[in-house]
Design a protein with these regions (language model features):
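C-terminal and inter-domain tail/linker signature
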Residues: 1-159
Length: 159
């Protein structure tokens, strides 16, 4: 099954060929960069060289992101991304994702929920990126980033 088939909700105006292409490019970027362990190849293909990165852990530039995820896959070979929702409007692509085994090799890892925002150029390459990341909890510890043993207030789940 391809990542495109796994994307639960895809919102895009099918008449907006640039937005459709931008979604395809971001989905393929995720697939190559994380799931196929081709981070440097994927970032070279789908990001501009002077790509602006707003995540403070990663330097600007497509090469920096490629090296970062190559390092992640080297440390955690089972790291994967699952795209749950993806939306394209104009030059922007918004993706709601789960990065599993990004930080650990635990087979029971619940992952890191993320919302990625990409600004794309007219050629369909990402020129800028923002993200918000949050550890995914479980029924016994719904907010591991706050404190241990905080019970869930609802059963909705993150995705």
């Amino acid at each position: 099954m391809t990542l495109k088939a796994e994307a639960g909700i895809v919102l895009v105006d099918p008449r907006d060929h640039h937005a459709v292409r931008n979604i395809d490019n971001v989905l393929t970027l995720y697939q190559m960069m994380i799931n196929e362990n081709k981070a440097e190849e994927g970032t070279a293909k789908f990001l501009t060289r002077d790509y602006i990165q707003h995540n403070p852990l990663i330097a600007d530039g497509s090469a920096s992101l490629g090296k970062y995820f190559a390092g992640v896959k080297s440390a955690h070979p089972n790291a994967q991304v699952v795209v749950h929702r993806i939306v394209a409007v104009g030059d922007y692509v918004f993706a709601h994702v789960n990065f599993v085994n990004l930080l650990t090799d635990d087979p029971n890892d619940k992952g890191v929920a993320g919302v990625d925002i990409y600004k794309m150029n007219t050629d369909g390459k990402a020129i800028e990126h923002w993200d918000a990341l949050q550890l995914v909890g479980n029924s016994q510890n719904s907010a591991p980033w706050v404190a241990p043993d905080i019970p869930r207030a609802n059963s909705n789940g993150m995705f």
